[in-house]
Amino acid sequence: MYLIADWRRTHYSEEVIPEMDGQEVILMGWVHSIRALGKLAFVILRDREGTIQAVVPKQKVDEETFAIAKKLGKEDIIAIRGKVVANEKAPKGFEVIPIEIRVLNKADAPLPLDPSEKVAAEIDTRLDKRFLDIRRPKIQAIFKIRSEMLRSIRKTFADGGFVEVNTPKLVASATEGGTELFPISYFEKEAFLGQSPQLYKQMMMAGGFDKVFEIAQIFRAEEHNTRRHLNEAISIDTEMSFVNEKDAMAMLEKVVYNCYADIEYNRPQEIELLELNWEIPEKTFDKITYTEAIDIANAKGVEIEWGEDLSRAAERAVGDEMGGLYFITEWPTQTRPFYTLPHKHDNKVCKAFDLMYKELEISSGAQRVHKYDLLVENISNMGMNPDSFETYLEAFKFGMPPHAGWGLGADRFAMVLTAQDNIRECVLFPRDRQRLTP
């Protein structure tokens, strides 16, 4: 085996084209497949961008190079220095004839998982051997689209004058008063893993930042075992001052629309590889009220009372009717957290919204309460002690502007963009009730 020494990759596989006929290149990656046929060997090298064929004819290479090629195993790490030779019969209109092959590392055999995708594996097996699973081109395509999604979102926020922030993930109490928190030992105290940056986002509005966003982990100790829930997730959160819930919804529409447009422009190969039925949405999404959603569900035989949260059956009924991306607005105040602003004309209804894709909720937001007295009243009415929120409430005593915001589930949005039916497909190392490794 060789060290990398003075060799450096000159091209990824997708950068080599027939017009480079006669040019010398250095390629590095994994042995995707190997076929040795007497005096001829075919080596398919795979790197991050795809695959490329190296043809090793015994009469055109030295003895050592041919001997190395014949002994290669699947998933060995290799480097090839060779010449591009145009050939209309080759898969991409060219092949590479090696001048030298270096084996940088050997892979054990048999492989516990087949990255070539010729042998199917259950998702639990794939997640157990995730380092091999993510070598698969289709899996890499999912995460390249996810990466472009995050890049696009950051750019949209930056172009809009937002400040990126980082809030604590070790907290002293529940953000929303719930009990679904992971407790941890924090020296002599009890602490929790943060379930939301919500309170900190609002405190920054009191600090005069005007517009902030954060992309970070959240933790929920919910005992779900579904295809759409995880206990550790990435949340894309924003908060804006001197706006209402309609402005927040407009910003969310812009973020989502730009993601679709940027992915279409920058990741066409991944869209094709995943065979996605890609369609950029309209710049504004359909909107229905909670009451209208209830009516749709009831009309489809799903009984739900006004004031109840939407059940899975109700979400499916509404999703079947609406399709695509749409907002549900005007939620019952009792279904929303204490910091959600009720309507002036009817305090049973609040200025909250959910962004749905078919039956899947991908974002939730609202205009927030910015008056101290109302906030204290809401906390008390929900059976919580305002003293537990002392540092948060203090920010509302000395000049808190009207504000609104939302949180968008990055993992769920990636599910939508890549048309996956299990959220675990879109997370490198998912954490759920059963899985804490790798």
From Swiss-Prot:
This is Aspartate--tRNA(Asp/Asn) ligase. It catalyses: tRNA(Asx) + L-aspartate + ATP = L-aspartyl-tRNA(Asx) + AMP + diphosphate. GO terms for cellular component: aminoacyl-tRNA synthetase multienzyme complex; cytosol. Aspartyl-tRNA synthetase with relaxed tRNA specificity since it is able to aspartylate not only its cognate tRNA(Asp) but also tRNA(Asn). Reaction proceeds in two steps: L-aspartate is first activated by ATP to form Asp-AMP and then transferred to the acceptor end of tRNA(Asp/Asn). ATP binds at R220, A221, E222, R228, H229, L230, E361, G409, A410, D411, R412. Homodimer. The keyword DNA-binding does not apply. Its EC number is 6.1.1.23. Pfam families: tRNA-synt_2, tRNA_anti-codon. Gene3D superfamilies: Bira Bifunctional Protein, Domain 2 (3.30.930.10), Nucleic acid-binding proteins (2.40.50.140). It is an enzyme of class 6 (ligase). Belongs to the class-II aminoacyl-tRNA synthetase family. Type 2 subfamily. PROSITE patterns: AA_TRNA_LIGASE_II. Mg(2+) 2 binds at E361, S364. The keyword Signal does not apply. It comes from Methanococcus maripaludis (strain C5 / ATCC BAA-1333). L-aspartate binds at E176, R220, S364, R368. Binds 3 Mg(2+) cations per subunit. The strongest magnesium site (Mg1) is bound to the beta- and gamma-phosphates of ATP and four water molecules complete its coordination sphere. One of its GO terms (biological process) is aspartyl-tRNA aminoacylation. Keywords: Aminoacyl-tRNA synthetase, ATP-binding, Cytoplasm, Ligase, Magnesium, Metal-binding, Nucleotide-binding, Protein biosynthesis. Its main location: cytoplasm. Transmembrane segments: none annotated. The record marks P91 as: Important for tRNA non-discrimination. Mg(2+) 3 binds at E361. It comes from the Archaea.
